[in-house]
Amino acid sequence: MGKTIFITGASSGLGKAAALLFAARGWTVVATMRNPDSAPELAGTQGVSVLALDVTDPAQIRQVVEKVLAIHRVDVVLNNAGYGLAGPFEGATDDDLRRQIDTNLMGVLRVTQAFLPHLRQNRSGTIVTITSVGGHVTFPFNSVYHATKWGLEGWNESLAFELAELGIRAKTVAPGGILTDFAGRSLTLTKHPAYDALVQKTMAGFGKNSNRSTADQIAEVVWQAATDGKDQVHYVAGKDAKFLIRLRKWLGVPRFLGMIRRRFLG
């Protein structure tokens, strides 16, 4: 029997690349996104079903998961939906904060929880959650985004303990920079005039990263995490992410933070 993967945030970038990769390798793919009309290529791909799903809508999550499980035995859940909130924390509105946490953190928890009875009954399955290098290191003007990604890493690591006893694996994949339109399509900026000069310095620092990976390269790491059968909990994807995480460990946190401060804030 063929295997099935359920993907959130599959309209573009990594989610789309993962959907196409798994489909090309013979899997049945349930690709979900807020607006299915935005992904005609996926809708026309053999083995891919496209469904509408907003991970901030608990009722819709329950309905979609119930619909999918009536047809498919889901083997892998890929939590990919998310976006970046960047800029001065002081400039973030309550709606900014709520939306970031609701999408990046609560959306993952809701989708995962909806699938757990199915995976537990089967005593098998893998949950792969896309976090970020920003779940292991920090940069200026990304505080709330970091809160969600560090939160996901801690949540998943704890969850992996309890699910392992039930035959279910819980894993994270932490990509570095990806050559997609994330900065345009999936980035919201906060503003506050007191921080304008510092924000400009920081943005210039981000522009120096030339080691970003393609979405296809990161999707290969997702494939590895989903199919290698290992109990490994954390996966890091991309040369830049691996370098930064190793550098933080090698330098120690105080020296690493000093380096980041000098690079981005002068």
What are these regions (language model features)?
Residues 11-12:
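Conserved glycine-rich cofactor-binding loop
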Residues 53-63, 94:
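The beta1-alpha1 cofactor-binding region of Rossmann-like NAD(H)/NADP(H)-dependent oxidoreductases
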Residues 88-89, 93-98:
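Substrate-binding pocket helix/loop in short-chain dehydrogenase/reductase
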Residues 90, 137-144:
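Active-site loop immediately N-terminal to the catalytic Tyr-X3-Lys motif
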Residues 112, 148:
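Active-site helix of classical SDR
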Residues 132:
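Residue(s) in the substrate-gating loop at a strand-loop-helix junction
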Residues 162-209:
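C-terminal beta-strand-loop-alpha-helix "lid" module of Rossmann-like NAD(P)-dependent dehydrogenases
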